[in-house]
Amino acid sequence: MFCSMLACGQNGEIGLNGELPWEGQYPEDREFYEGQTELALRIGTRGAIAHFSPNRPCCLISANVQKPKDCIYVYNWKKLSVEQIFADIEERVEFQKKIIVGGVKWYHATASFVDRIYLTRIAKNFDSDRKVDLSIILANRKKISSRSARSNTELIFETWE
């Protein structure tokens, strides 16, 4: 199963100077992310995967084919289609769950190919230099669940299929 996982502000804000605009403000969102990705393969761009660890497997999507230590594979999505990348990952990697973790262009490119989307909406505006377009990411999707965070009413956790 391929999924996308993202959190964004009211206007799609997801990044500022290489970090989350709300970095450190929402521990429950961080816990949700880590819980979902703990036993999954993370797939994302260099800016989206901040830390490489043998305990947190990942594949990079990058035109720079240099493979960081503790990264399983690097895919150049300028040369390979989303379908080719997903098929190769499916063939090579035994993880049942594979999660797209960013960046913006990769979220948009994979939106119609993923089986499920985990979206954390933050009911607040943020300064940002990176925004996602939720109309692309959620096109032709149905919301299957929604819940407010226990600790902060600004957070809403949604699941889309």
Positions of PLM-derived features:
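Enzymes that bind and transform nitrogen-containing heteroaromatic metabolites
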Residues: 1-161
